[in-house]
Each structure stands twice: as structure tokens, then as C-alpha cells.
């Protein structure tokens, strides 16, 4: 259903732009169009739903981040990852092997400009100073990363022209730094101080990893949003425009 609008019937007009929002940890009953008694007002989503399609009998083969994203990006069943959990820290390599067609890559083939802003979470390969792939979780793995090296299986090598985001969950996993394209322009320099973070039931979900200067836990989703809005603004100003596919991937 997501791809159908991109394949116009013979004689149809221009290819449509596509905005795909992956709302991590959004419950079925959290949106007003599905649950009038929802505690969170969602007027914009409700308006979109009124003009589109409501899925009332949809089922997920996986309820966690990594397998879900793998399925969305590849069109394959989540069980094919062989992984029921999620990547953390410098975990990798990318589950989407080189040469596998992705949603972004397919749309690139149709002339789309493709962008992904937000959480990737299907693995990336980081290297140490000797050029050895790390592909492990934990603080020591993050400490070993050589940040001068490019990431060979970042999203820009898997079907996306633009990427800004995080390798894993940006507020709970060991590597608290942003990736721009296939590099980390501002590497982490110290251990995260969890003291100033808001106190709630999941306060200790933040693993004691390495954090980059200026990396604000409270502003993560807003930074992803700024990148998506800037991409849309830049696209609107172009005189010669290809259609765009924007994958906005929120954090958990």
C-alpha cells in the first residue's frame, strides 16, 4: 500500500512525493482516529486519517525496533533477520547486506531523491584504529571506534541520498552521537552524566555510554524534525525537482 502510489497507471501524471513516518512506541490506542478516548490529542493525524485509510486489522510480526525497521526497509519478513532483539552501541554489521534492494533504493531507481532522518537501528560497521571491524555492543566497543573512518554500510550506502541520525536508540544506547552521511562529525569525548536527566520510570534506561559535546537527550526528536523540515523546505525551493521519499524515523 505504501508503494502503490509510486507506480502510476499509464497516462497518469507526475510521481507523488512520499513522506513515511515511523512512530516508535506509538500504541494503537494513542491516536484519536482509532481511540476517541486517547489521552493525547492528535488532530493532524486524525485529519490525515479522515482523508485516507485506517488499518483496523493490521498485525506486526515483531514488536521491537530492529526487526520492524528491517521489514519496512527491505519488504522481507522480520524473522529473516535471525534476531529477536535490537542492536545497541557499535553493534553491526548492517542487517541489510550490500546489494539487497531497499525501499529507498527502489525509489531511487524511479528517479526519487531519498532521505532518512532519525534512528537507523539495523546495524552499522565501525572500525578500530587497526581497521578491524568492531560489531559489538557495550562501552568498551564504543571506546575502540576510530571516528576518522567512514561507515561503509550507513544508510547512504543502502538506498538513501541523505542521512542524519543515530545508529541505535539515541537516548538509551552506548553511542550518543549523530551520524551525518557516513561519518560522525562530532565524536563522543566522555561518559554520559545521567544525573541531570529527567527522573521517570525509565531513567536508568540510559546506558552509561560515550556522549558527544552538545548532544542533548531532550532535543533528539526535535533535531530529527528540524532536519526533515529543512529537507522539505529545500526541496520546495528547487526549480528542477525530482519527487522525494522522506523517511522520518523517530526514536523510542
Regions found by a protein language model. Give the residues of each.
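Formylglycine-dependent sulfatase
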Residues: 7-252
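Bacterial N-terminal signal peptides
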Residues: 1-5
Amino acid at each position: 500500500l505504501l508503494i502503490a502510489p509510486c507506480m502510476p497507471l499509464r497516462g497518469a501524471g507526475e510521481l507523488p512525493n512520499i513522506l513515511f513516518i515511523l512512530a516508535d512506541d506509538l500504541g494503537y490506542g494513542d491516536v484519536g482516529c482509532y481511540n476517541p478516548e486517547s489521552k493525547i490529542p492528535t488532530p493532524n493525524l486524525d485529519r490525515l486519517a479522515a482523508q485516507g485509510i485506517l488499518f483496523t486489522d493490521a498485525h506486526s510480526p515483531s514488536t521491537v525496533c530492529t526487526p520492524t525497521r528491517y521489514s519496512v526497509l527491505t519488504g522481507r519478513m522480520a524473522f529473516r533477520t535471525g534476531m529477536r532483539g535490537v542492536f545497541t552501541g557499535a553493534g553491526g554489521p548492517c542487517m541489510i547486506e550490500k546489494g539487497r534492494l531497499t525501499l529507498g533504493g527502489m525509489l531511487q531507481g524511479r528517479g526519487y531523491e531519498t532521505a532518512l532522518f532519525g534512528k537507523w537501528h539495523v546495524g552499522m560497521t565501525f572500525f578500530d584504529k587497526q581497521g578491524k571491524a568492531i560489531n559489538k555492543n557495550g562501552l568498551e566497543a564504543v571506546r575502540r571506534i576510530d571516528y576518522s573512518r567512514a561507515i561503509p554500510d550507513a544508510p547512504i550506502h543502502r538506498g538513501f541520498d541523505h542521512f542524519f541520525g543515530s545508529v541505535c536508540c539515541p537516548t538509551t544506547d552506548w553511542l550518543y552521537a549523530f551520524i551525518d552521511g557516513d561519518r560522525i562529525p562530532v565524536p563522543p569525548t566522555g561518559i554520559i552524566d545521567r544525573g541531570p536527566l529527567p527522573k521517570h520510570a525509565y531513567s536508568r534506561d540510559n546506558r552509561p555510554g560515550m556522549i558527544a559535546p552538545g548532544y542533548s537527550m531532550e532535543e533528539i526528536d526535535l533535531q530529527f524534525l528540524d532536519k526533515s523540515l529543512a529537507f522539505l523546505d529545500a526541496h520546495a525551493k528547487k526549480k528542477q525537482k525530482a519527487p522525494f521519499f522522506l523517511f522520518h524515523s523517530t526514536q523510542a
